[in-house]
């Protein structure tokens, strides 16, 4: 018999085999393990503090005071010292969990949950102890949060359960499981319902992105199919029209045919298929949310948390912590609400001001790019300026994300909500609002204002002497596409790289710090780690080994899961709001999410400390946020198609001004469209000659001195007033927007009505469950009455 087979004879539990494999991997002793009986003495939480030798130091006194307060609540404290760190292992008394179970049973909203019927899991123990720790105050009135801020304690964390952690790593948190299903029930048991619902929602969102991504690719291929044969592209590429200079100082006239490539790219995203796709995505967003509600209802019903109330559980935890506690009453102050409203408004004005700064950057960058010696950049100065603006926008987003978080937390402190759940809802709404304005203010400018407020030759609009940007003759939609593509690609790619590499590098660097201790521990484990009853009771070295393993993982906090939700909801916004300008957005989101699920799983199960398991029955206020995004998507896409794209002007030209409008059947209906959208500026006009006063500005590449040039607008060639065609196009634009939004909104309401939130099976299961529960209560009452008699 080989050595490995002999060793396996001693493995009575999966935990033993896991431990032996880890010891062999780390170079520990491979001597056989003794059969083990799992210990019942688990640690619920660990506090870490810096070692203070001076007993009179304020930090040492506060540490002792806090530990004494915990001991008064019958929490067992195990103190271990390692180098300059002091570890406090905390274990709550069984009575606290019995009180919790009883209060759940008599609760109005929580009495139907699974915890009220079964035993207390380790996840529940952690949640209870976490609450007790944060609600424990020392004689100075400070709680744990304030002690952590004052460096009395360095950190706090709950411990990973090694056996369950390894099982999750094997089934879920690995790259080889990229295209397999998620063990949501196992995630729920280990990380709690809140984390499980995040992965359930993310998996559902990713699954429903498949049809959206497929249709987006079809729309893109539709534009690609007519890439070279479209008459509008031919008109641009074969044109000899001379266009007016794009800027004041360094730009000269140019030929429309110079932008042939730009016109082709514009047609990829600005075509007839875009309208149908935008309508589909608006209805898709509604169906996604309605089907998600059904999917959620099925799982929370199985988990027995359908009627769970977080605020009520918080009241129960308050009583468990202090039977004489008083509830934190609901309060409303008009002064506080007004102050918060003013501060939010000021913050939004600051964010919009940053968007204006980005506009100024592009206005200044475009003429500067036209001065460089590199011909490629010089010829595509406007496009390069847009791309640089998008990169700068991304940098602004990264900076403002931290500012927005700090401001949102401070505003929540001003509001003084009565529960953590209420604080979380308030923080979510504020943070998302700030992030939304940070991300989309610049995009809204590009979509709805770029090229519409810049004026015309002889009367240009300027900022500090710099002319505002103009739209390309083929339309402004490509600028919006470039802006979205750069931000979305940078945000998703770089964020995922940093999300994974930073915790991984920290874990690798810290892993060697406890190597000596772990090797020493490898020789004593399972032999000396036994109590008098023969149960496995880790020695101090084994405890330190486990605590250090968790201590060296990346830190987590109450808003760690919020960050993941925010990232995905922002992506959902990009996927739906301006999808008319970027049909490939759902495809990029789908590819990103396939990796995002495993990336987040690997982070949580391998690289980060264990999140505090939270019990809930929904994704919370995020549902309302997603519904608001769905409504905004209808409005934004209607405006993008009706106002930003050339769909309506092309439609008007086809049926009112084009060859087909006059009954001609020999020419293409769109022949002459590009020329129809251009107006002419003559140098004989005094105001125009003043704008183009440099001699070099009106000289073409062939050396010809141009006496007139064209620009994109519907204006008279004599007095530059708006033509009747402009007003007709504008009227049709508004009519289209109103019609589009009403049709899509009706479709959304029909879809929401047609798909009920709760499946019939869930309703029936809950009915039978409640009936069985009531019958059980009745039998217990009769049994108690007969016992009394």
Range-by-range predicted roles:
Residues 2-789:
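Intrinsically disordered cytosolic tails
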């Amino acid at each position: 018999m080989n050595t490995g087979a002999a060793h396996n004879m001693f493995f009575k539990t999966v935990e033993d085999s896991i431990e032996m494999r880890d010891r062999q991997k780390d170079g520990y002793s491979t001597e056989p393990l003794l059969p083990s009986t799992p210990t019942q003495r688990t640690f619920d939480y660990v506090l870490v503090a810096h070692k203070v030798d001076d007993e009179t130091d304020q930090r040492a006194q506060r540490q002792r005071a806090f530990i004494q307060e915990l001991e008064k609540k019958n929490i067992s404290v195990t103190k271990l010292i390692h180098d300059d760190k002091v570890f406090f292992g905390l274990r709550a008394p069984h009575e606290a969990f019995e009180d919790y179970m009883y209060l759940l049973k008599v609760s109005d909203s929580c009495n139907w949950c699974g915890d009220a019927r079964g035993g207390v899991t380790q996840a529940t123990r952690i949640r209870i102890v976490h609450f007790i720790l944060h609600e424990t105050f020392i004689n100075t009135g400070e709680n744990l949060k304030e002690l952590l801020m004052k460096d009395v304690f360095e950190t706090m964390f709950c411990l990973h359960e090694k056996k369950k952690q390894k099982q999750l790593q094997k089934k879920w948190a690995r790259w080889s499981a990229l295209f397999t299903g998620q063990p949501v029930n196992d995630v729920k048991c280990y990380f709690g319902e809140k984390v499980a619902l995040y992965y359930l929602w993310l998996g559902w969102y990713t699954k429903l992105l498949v049809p959206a991504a497929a249709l987006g690719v079809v729309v893109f291929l539709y534009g690609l199919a007519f890439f070279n044969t479209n008459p509008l592209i031919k008109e641009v590429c074969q044109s000899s029209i001379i266009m007016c200079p794009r800027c004041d100082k360094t730009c000269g006239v140019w030929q429309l045919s110079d932008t042939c490539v730009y016109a082709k790219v514009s047609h990829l995203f600005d075509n007839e298929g875009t309208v149908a796709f935008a309508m589909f995505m608006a209805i898709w967003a509604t169906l996604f949310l309605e089907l998600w509600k059904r999917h959620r209802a099925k799982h929370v019903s199985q988990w027995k948390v359908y009627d769970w109330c977080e605020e009520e559980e918080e009241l129960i935890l308050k009583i468990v912590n202090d039977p004489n506690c008083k509830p934190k009453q609901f309060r409303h102050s008009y002064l506080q609400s007004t102050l918060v409203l003013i501060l939010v408004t000021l913050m939004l004005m600051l964010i919009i001001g940053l968007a204006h700064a980005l506009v100024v950057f592009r206005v200044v960058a475009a003429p500067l790019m036209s001065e460089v010696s590199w011909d490629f950049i010089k010829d595509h100065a406007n496009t390069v300026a847009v791309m640089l603006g998008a990169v700068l926008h991304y940098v602004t987003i990264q900076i403002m994300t931290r500012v927005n978080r700090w401001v949102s937390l401070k505003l929540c402190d001003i509001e003084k909500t009565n529960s953590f759940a209420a604080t979380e809802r308030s923080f979510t709404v504020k943070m998302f609002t700030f992030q939304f304005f940070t991300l989309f203010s610049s995009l809204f400018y590009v979509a709805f204002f770029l090229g519409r407020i810049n004026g015309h030759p002889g009367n240009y609009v300027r900022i500090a002497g710099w002319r505002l940007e103009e739209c390309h003759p083929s339309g402004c939609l490509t600028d919006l596409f470039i802006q979205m593509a750069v931000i979305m690609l940078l945000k998703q790619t770089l964020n995922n790289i940093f999300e994974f590499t930073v915790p991984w590098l920290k874990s690798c660097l810290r892993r060697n710090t406890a190597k000596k201790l772990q090797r020493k521990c490898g020789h004593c484990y399972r032999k000396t780690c036994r109590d008098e009853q023969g149960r496995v009771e880790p020695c101090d070295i084994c405890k330190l080994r486990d605590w250090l393993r968790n201590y060296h993982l990346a830190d987590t906090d109450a808003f760690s899961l919020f960050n993941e939700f925010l990232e995905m909801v922002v992506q959902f916004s990009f996927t739906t709001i301006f999808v008319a300008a970027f049909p490939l957005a759902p495809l990029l989101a789908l590819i990103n999410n396939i990796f995002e699920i495993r990336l987040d799983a690997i982070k949580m199960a391998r690289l980060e400390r264990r999140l505090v398991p939270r019990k809930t029955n929904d994704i919370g206020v995020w549902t309302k946020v997603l519904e608001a995004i769905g409504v905004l998507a209808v409005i934004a896409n209607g405006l993008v198609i009706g106002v930003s794209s050339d769909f309506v002007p092309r439609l008007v030209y086809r049926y009112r001004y084009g060859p087909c409008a006059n009954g001609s059947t020999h020419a293409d209906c769109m022949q002459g469209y590009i020329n129809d959208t251009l107006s002419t500026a003559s140098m004989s006009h005094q105001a125009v000659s003043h704008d183009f006063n440099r001699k070099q500005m009106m000289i073409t590449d062939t050396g010809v001195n141009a006496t007139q040039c064209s620009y994109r607008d519907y204006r008279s060639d004599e007095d530059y007033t708006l033509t009747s065609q402009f007003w007709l196009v504008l009227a049709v634009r508004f009519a289209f927007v109103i019609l589009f939004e009403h049709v899509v909104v009706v479709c959304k309401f029909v879809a929401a009505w047609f798909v009920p939130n709760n499946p019939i099976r869930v309703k029936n299961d809950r009915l039978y469950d409640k009936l069985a529960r009531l019958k059980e209560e009745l039998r217990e009452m009769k049994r108690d009455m007969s016992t009394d008699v």
